[in-house]
C-alpha cells in the first residue's frame, strides 16, 4: 500500500483541519498522531480514507474529561452544540476522520436522526432532560460539610451562618439543659448562695408551699410574667371559690331577712301574750303577778336571740322554701322554729314554777 497520500487526500485533510479549527468550541482537537498509527483505507468510490489507530482507553478518558469540563462551564447539552452545516462535513472523507471506532463516546452528528429528533422535541435548553436532570442532582445534593478554617473568625462566622440557616428551616425544639441551668441560677440567686450542697439541703428541708412559691417565681421570671398581680387576683378570688357562694353571704344575717320572719315574730308575741293572762289570772296574790312581769320581759329576749339564729339557719338549709305560718298548733313547722317555740313554752313554765310549787 502506498503510504504517501495523493493531493486530493491532502486537500480533504486541509479542509477537515480548517473545519476543526473553526469549531474548536464543540470538537476536541487532537495532537498530530504518530505516523505509525496513521493508515489509509480505500473507501467508497475509490476515495482513500485516513484512519488513526488510537488507544480506546486513553482517548476515552481524554474525551470524557475534556467534554465534561467544557459542558459544565457553558452548561449546554450535547444536542445544542453548534455543529457546522457545510457540505464538507457530510462527505465521506471527513466522516472517516472520526477518531475512534467506538461511536458511543462520540457526540451525535448534527444531521443524524437522533440529533434531529432531539432538536425537534426540545427547542430550548430548559426543556432538555439532560439539563433538568443536572439541576435536580444539584438540588438533591446535601450541603457540603464545613471545611477547616485557617482563622477562627472566619470559621465562627461560617458556623453562625450555617446555624442561622438551619434554625430558619427547622422547627425549634426547646433545650431543656439551658432551662435547667437558668432555673438553678435563679434558685442560687434567691437563696443567696453559690454552693450546690446548700441548694440541695434547702430542697430537702423546705416545705411544699415554699417550693411551690419559689418554682412559680422562677418560672414567672423566665416567662416574664408579673407574678404579684396574678397572686393578688388569686388571693382575692380564693374565699369566694372556697364557699361557692357570692361574698354577700358573709354580711351580717340581719341584712337579708326572709319576708315571713316578721310575721313569725308577731305570731309568737301574740301567742305568748295570749297565754300569759290565762296563767296569771288564776293566781290572785301580788307576788304571783310580779313573776309574770319577769316572764313578759324574757320572751322578747328569746325572740331577739332567735332573730340572730333563725334566719341564718333557714338561709343555709332551705333558702327557697315557701313561707309557712309558724304557730304552736301547726305540726308541719320547720325544726328550727319548733325548737324556738319549745324554748318559749318552757320559759313561762319555769317562771311560773315557784307559784305552782307554793300552791
Swiss-Prot record:
Region (Disordered): 90-117, 132-161, 235-359
The gene coding this protein: C4orf17
Basic and acidic residues compositional bias, start-end: 286-299
Pfam families, per database record: SPATIAL
Protein's name in the database: Uncharacterized protein C4orf17
Polar residues bias: start-end ranges: 151-161
Originating organism: Homo sapiens (Human)
Biased composition (Low complexity): 245-259
Amino acid at each position: 500500500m502506498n503510504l504517501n497520500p495523493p493531493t486530493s487526500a491532502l486537500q480533504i485533510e486541509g479542509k477537515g483541519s480548517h473545519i476543526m479549527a473553526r469549531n474548536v468550541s464543540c470538537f476536541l482537537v487532537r495532537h498530530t498522531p504518530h505516523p505509525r498509527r496513521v493508515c489509509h483505507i480505500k473507501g467508497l468510490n475509490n476515495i482513500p480514507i485516513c484512519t488513526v489507530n488510537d488507544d480506546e482507553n486513553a482517548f476515552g478518558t481524554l474525551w470524557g474529561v475534556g467534554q465534561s469540563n467544557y459542558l459544565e462551564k457553558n452548561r449546554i447539552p450535547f444536542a445544542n452544540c453548534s455543529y457546522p452545516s457545510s457540505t464538507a462535513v457530510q462527505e465521506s472523507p471527513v466522516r472517516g476522520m472520526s477518531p475512534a471506532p467506538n461511536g458511543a463516546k462520540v457526540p451525535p452528528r448534527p444531521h443524524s436522526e437522533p440529533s434531529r429528533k432531539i432538536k425537534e422535541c426540545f427547542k430550548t435548553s430548559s426543556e432538555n432532560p439532560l439539563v433538568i436532570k443536572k439541576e435536580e442532582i444539584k438540588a438533591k445534593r446535601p450541603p457540603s460539610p464545613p471545611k477547616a478554617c485557617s482563622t477562627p473568625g472566619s470559621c465562627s462566622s461560617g458556623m453562625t451562618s450555617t446555624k442561622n440557616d438551619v434554625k430558619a428551616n427547622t422547627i425549634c425544639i426547646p433545650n431543656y439543659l439551658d432551662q435547667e441551668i437558668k432555673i438553678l441560677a435563679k434558685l442560687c440567686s434567691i437563696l443567696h448562695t453559690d454552693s450546690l450542697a446548700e441548694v440541695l439541703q434547702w430542697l430537702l428541708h423546705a416545705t411544699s408551699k415554699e417550693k411551690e412559691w419559689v418554682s412559680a417565681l422562677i418560672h414567672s421570671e423566665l416567662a416574664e410574667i408579673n407574678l404579684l398581680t396574678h397572686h393578688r387576683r388569686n388571693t382575692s378570688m380564693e374565699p369566694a371559690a372556697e364557699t361557692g357562694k357570692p361574698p354577700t353571704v358573709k354580711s351580717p344575717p340581719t341584712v337579708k331577712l326572709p319576708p315571713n320572719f316578721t310575721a313569725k315574730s308577731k305570731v309568737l308575741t301574740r301567742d305568748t301574750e295570749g297565754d300569759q293572762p290565762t296563767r296569771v289570772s288564776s293566781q290572785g296574790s301580788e307576788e304571783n303577778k310580779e313573776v309574770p312581769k319577769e316572764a313578759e320581759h324574757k320572751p322578747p329576749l328569746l325572740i331577739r336571740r332567735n332573730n340572730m339564729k333563725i334566719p341564718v339557719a333557714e338561709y343555709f338549709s332551705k333558702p327557697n322554701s315557701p313561707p309557712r305560718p309558724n304557730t304552736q298548733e301547726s305540726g308541719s313547722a320547720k325544726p328550727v322554729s319548733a325548737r324556738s317555740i319549745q324554748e318559749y313554752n318552757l320559759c313561762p313554765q319555769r317562771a311560773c314554777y315557784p307559784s305552782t310549787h307554793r300552791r
